[in-house]
Every structure is written in C-alpha cells, then in structure tokens.
Amino acid sequence: MAKPLTDSERQKQISVRGIAGLGDVAEVRKSFNRHLHFTLVKDRNVATPRDYFFALAHTVRDHLVGRWIRTQQHYYERDPKRIYYLSLEFYMGRTLQNTMVNLGLQTACDEATYQLGLDLEELEEIEEDAGLGNGGLGRLAACFLDSMATLGLAAYGYGIRYEFGIFNQKIVNGWQVEEADDWLRYGNPWEKARPEYMLPVHFYGRVEHTPNGVLWLDTQVVLAMPYDTPVPGYKNNTVNTMRLWSAKAPNDFKLKDFNVGDYIEAVLDRNLAENISRVLYPNDNFFEGKELRLKQEYFVVAATLQDIIRRFKSSKFGCRDPVRTCFETFPDKVAIQLNDTHPALSIPELMRILVDVEKVDWDKAWEITKKTCAYTNHTVLPEALERWPVSMFEKLLPRHLEIIYAINQRHLDHVAALFPGDVDRLRRMSVIEEGDCKRINMAHLCVIGSHAVNGVARIHSEIVKQSVFKDFYELEPEKFQNKTNGITPRRWLLLCNPGLAEIIVERIGEGFLTDLSQLKKLLSLVDDEAFIRDVAKVKQENKLKFSAQLEKEYKVKINPCSMFDVHVKRIHEYKRQLLNCLHIITLYNRIKKDPTKTFVPRTVMIGGKAAPGYHMAKMIIKLVTSIGDVVNHDPVVGDRLRVIFLENYRVSLAEKVIPAADLSQQISTAGTEASGTGNMKFMLNGALTIGTMDGANVEMAEEAGEENLFIFGMRVEDVEALDQKGYNAQEFYERLPELRQAVDQISSGFFSPKDPDCFKDVVNMLMYHDRFKVFADYEAYIQCQAQVDHLYRNPKDWTKKVIRNIACSGKFSSDRTITEYAREIWGVEPSDLQIPPP
C-alpha cells in the first residue's frame, strides 16, 4: 500500500504551478483554439460569434483558476479572519473585460483575437450582464468585492443565484414593458457548481422544547447548491470567491408523503421548492412583504451560516475533521457584514445554531453574535424599511420567531432599566411593532444584534443617528459609524474610459489605480494647455463613440457637439426625474418663444427602470418619452434640444454613457438619497455635477470645492422647515409663470394629444401630495441650469473644472471605503502581499 502523503507533498500534487501561463499572444491563440475545439466542439466553419466569445472566456478563465486555487490554499495556511459580505443583490455586469483588466491580459487577448480575424470589442458585447441587482445596493456589493480582492482581504460574497435577474426593459409606445432576463440561457462560463457543498435549508415545521434543548421538527427541506465565481484583485494574484446559492428540491421531495399516489405530480411539484432562487424581486427602495421573498432571505442566510461554520471548524488545508469546537474565538475568525436588512435573519439564525445545535448558553451566544455581525443601513425612506408580519414568521420560521421574542424581551428589559417609566421609548425601540398586524422591524433587529451600524455617506449617517435610529444612538452611541460609499476605479475608469486613463497615466503614472488619492497630483495640471486639450479631446471622442452607438441601437441621430446632459438611475419620485422634465419643458418653451436666440445645444438623456408595480414611476417614463416625441419632432427646435430615453439602463450601458457625459444630474430632495454612487462615476469620468446637497454630493462638493459643482436647492434644514410650515405646491405654481406653463402643458395633453388625461395622476401628485417637493426647488434648479449653459459656452473654463473634479475624486474609491470597514468594523488590515503567480 502506498505511503500516505505528507501535507506539503499533497499540496505539491494539487498545486497548479506546472501549468504554463497564457500571458503571451501565441499562448492565448493556442488556448482559444483548444477551447473552441475541445470545450465547444466546433471548428471555424460552424462556430458562431457566441462560440468565439465562450472560447475566449474559457481562455481567460484558465488564467484565473491557478491563482484562485493558490489564493484559497494561502487562506487555509494563514487562517486569517474571514470577511463574509452577505447581500441579496450582486449587480456584477459583464465579467470578461474586467477579468482581462485585473489580470493584465487585455493586450495579449486583443492582439490574439486580431490575429484570429476577430474583433475583441464585438466579442465583449456578446456577454450577458449578470443583473443580479436592482441598482446602487447591488452594484456597491460588486465594487466592494473588487476592492476586497485588490486589498488582499480573505473575503467572500454570499448571495442568491437568481435564474432571472433584473427584468429587461423594453419601451413600447412610450411605456415600460418588462421582459424576463434569461441571463443563463447560453450558460455562464465564469461559475463553477459545487454540488459537494450542497446544504439543507429548513422551513415551516414546529418547535418542541425538551429537557435536552429545543428541537425544530417536521420541517420542509430545500437544498442549497453553491455556484462559485472567481473575483480577481487588480494585478495582485489574489482571487476571492463569490458563492451564490441555487435552490434544489431533495430527491424524496413530496414522495415521502405516503398519501401522494401521483409520482408525476410530486416530481412536477419540485418546481415549488426550486422557485426560491427563480427571480430577483425588482423593487428598489421599496418593501413588498411577500412570503417568497422572506424565503429567499432565510435561504441565503441559512446556507451561508452553515458554510461559515463548516469553514470555521475545519482547520488547515485538506483536513475535513472538525477541529475547532469552541466558539469563543468565532468573532476573531469571522466577520459578517449585512448589506441592508435583507440578510437580517443571520442574527436569529446564528443564535439558533449556537444555542440549539452547539449548546452554547444564551448570554455567551448573544455576545458572539453581536461581535460577529455588523449592519449597513442604505435608506431612510419609511416605505423601504422591512417590517415582516409576525403571522408569516409563525408559519415559516417558528423557532426564529421565538428567538426574536427572546432577543426583544432582553433588549426591552435593558432599556426599561436605563429609562424607567418611559413606556413610549419601549414602544419605539421594540423589535415587535404592535397594531392590527403585529410586525417585526428588521432594522431594529439589526441594530440590536450588531456591534457596528453604519450609514453610507456623512449626511446620511447623521440622519441615521438623529432621526431613523435616534433612540438606539442614545443607548449605544459608540456603535454608530459612517462609511462613505465608493466605486472601483478599475471598472469605472480603466475599463470604461481607457482614453482618459491613458492620458492620466502619461502624466502621473499608474499608481492611482490602486491609490486613487494620487489623482490629487492632477491639480498641478489645471492650467496646463496640453492636458486641457487632451481631456477635452478624450471627452469628445467618447461622445462621438456613444453617438454612433445610439444611432446603431436606437436609430436616433444626435448632435455630438451638444452638451450631453445625463440623468440615469432607478426611476423613483425621490430621485426627481420630474424636476428634470420640468426643466426640459421650460427650455423647449424658451426656444419656441424666441427661436432666433442662440441656445447651448443639449441632448438630455434619461434612463432607468421602474419597479413593475410602481405606477407613478411608470408614468414618469411615459412622460419622458412623450416629451421626447414632441421636442424631437419640432422643426423649430432642430438639434438644439433632444430628449432621449435610454432603454434598459444596466451596468454595461452605464460603462458607455458615463464616459460620454458632460453633465451629471443628482437632484434628489435633500435628505432622501443615502449616498448615491453614480454621482462618483460621473465625477471620475469628467462630467460636472448639477445636484442638491444630498448623499455623497455633499462630500464631493467638499473635496472639489462647491464652486466646481452646480449646487442648488433646499438643504436638509430647509426641507425640514418647509415640512414644519407645510409645503404648498400651488403657491409655487401661482408664483412662477414658466412652471405654471409647463405644468399646464402636461395636464392639458400638449404632450399626449391622443390621450389628454394621460398625465392627470402625475399633475395631481405634483400639485397636492408631492412628498419630494419638486416645485419648491424648480426656480433654483432653472437658474442653476442657466449657469451650466453659461460655463459650457466657455469650453476651456469648463474643462478646467472637469480636471479639478477628476483630481478631487480620490476619496470616492471603494478601496478607501473597504479599508475603513476593514480597520474600523472588521478588525483586519489590508495586505499588499502578492501571492506568487501559478
């Protein structure tokens, strides 16, 4: 019998050092042809463009796997504290180009595909976006994964592998129509299924209290199948893992119910279990209390926590025996970050495992849970806060309900001891909201069960402390932090705007790509004629390229010398796309009134998806398209004003439009946008911002100087004062003739001649119940837009402001954000250690 291998011998066998790298062009070509032949089983006679994309994707993926295995081996050996980022959304976009960029493979692949008679850009366009997110929250998670890998943190993203991501948006007769996003139809070359790590997740059932502890019995079981996707850091040979769970019915599903005589019926019903990971809920900043959604939230939490504990218990590489049985050190080895309240069930689930399964006593378990978990709040809108009916929990997760009651009881006892007799405070701070329908406030559960709570921009974190969680802040002020959001400069500069990246590298080197604060060095070039020329030239090239794409995709001709005024984000009343509409109508009316006057030509682009059930958001889209129909076909206007609705806005479209934008619209009512990250992307890519003092705009103005942004409108204090006084929209309507004219045109059917009453709901809302006070900021907004026009007439001064903005955008790198999370919440240090290449 062969002698058992030592640890190091076994590692050498598993190690992938022997596989040759693909760095050079000949290697890439060889690998490409090999995959076309052996993986896709095609030759050049029958291969489709999609086959070529897959051959290239597999070629690039080959380059990842050695580093991926290496990284995981490295973590096994060092056994560092691991970071678990739990999110129901990861809005990843496309992977091919990002992987080539982070591995430094782009040049080789470009040359190899050229030699093969193929166009790299055309192949990149074939890839589907991984649209497993709605907007900012999911995209933030994706940027964070990129930064965690680049900073060498032992981090894992955990979420759901939705079969259908965010819907594809079609515009039909000016209305949004949703289509299913079947992004996996052709297969996903980046993921690796891991059936060997499949785990059971339990639902329903009943609870039994026995002398030996608590049992959760007679549950329905669904299996969670993990799919792993590599997350490469930027040129540091680190490749982390994003693990997404897919729901599978167990083999005996419904067949163990002896009364089911119908085998076929039982097999068909497997779909019911597997529906858990079928589709992403398309709500942004809105809570819809559906049982399937609660199942999704528990599904990801239950599977992930089992996985975390399995990894905690297994010690070094190759050893599958549980070694650590004491949970004392759990918070020293594990940090769990909750991306909003969606994974809040991590708190009661970890308690259930520690108390019921691992037999840790309650107080010890609670201490471990609190030290492990941290919670990020993403919104202050009351309609977005998760409040689940107790009755739903009773049925679906009976043991978790008991645990939540116990957590709440101890919490309220603690509060009562500190504030005797303050009954209203107890009501306000309870996890359970009393009323017709008792509800569980998930945000309160998160605050109580975490050692750190953070907002995502300074102003938002202040609102969190002074309003949303005021009572909790008074109880434990040391818990509350700010972590201003950021974006990855790899995707949002190097990948999407190579022209700009190149002229920056020529001046200051490439250190800024991993230390964005180095962009400050560009301040010395604000008056450098050559640099001003280069920046303007790159912008113009980006605009020409995007104009060509618009013409190809949407059959719309636009003037590439016009100002590109861009407003892209989810469609929501608080983001105030309606304020933009009023400006467009006002500009239109001014051109019509005085057609001989010279106007700065503008192309206004508005894009974003509306939640399918959000009536007002869908009406806003219809209004934009209707205004476009009138403006774009008016011969008096010509190409001085164009209104384009960008259909199906998504990550891959953002990568095209943002580098081409001149003006970035960030015009939410002050106090409503937690941070925003689109604002940062535009700033980094050389657009100027028109915006309110809200979210991260405040810090952008602080970094670049308020005079280098177009800031207008009410501040948070003004909004509060107006609330106190009572907002009266009619007052503004009566006082401002241009506003009145615009509103009257909307209500009279000027923009909807075939259906004059089309927009009566919109006008009624604006006039009588507008929570977001569009009219109150109208006058300031119009004046501010006039200043934009004025500066745009002087291209050199405009470009100087652009350079100042780019130079001051360094703070808004997600590398900075993640470094702060690491040091101040997770208790780990970023590492610039290069894992040796395979």
Swiss-Prot record:
GO terms for biological process: glycogen catabolic process; glycogen metabolic process. Homodimer. Dimers associate into a tetramer to form the enzymatically active phosphorylase A. This is Glycogen phosphorylase, brain form. It comes from Rattus norvegicus. Keywords: Acetylation, Allosteric enzyme, Carbohydrate metabolism, Glycogen metabolism, Glycosyltransferase, Phosphoprotein, Pyridoxal phosphate, Transferase. Activity of phosphorylase is controlled both by allosteric means (through the non-covalent binding of metabolites) and by covalent modification. Thus AMP allosterically activates, whereas ATP, ADP, and glucose-6-phosphate allosterically inhibit, phosphorylase B. AMP binds at residues 43, 197, 310. InterPro entries: Glycg_phsphrylas, Glyco_trans_35, Pyridoxal_P_attach_site.
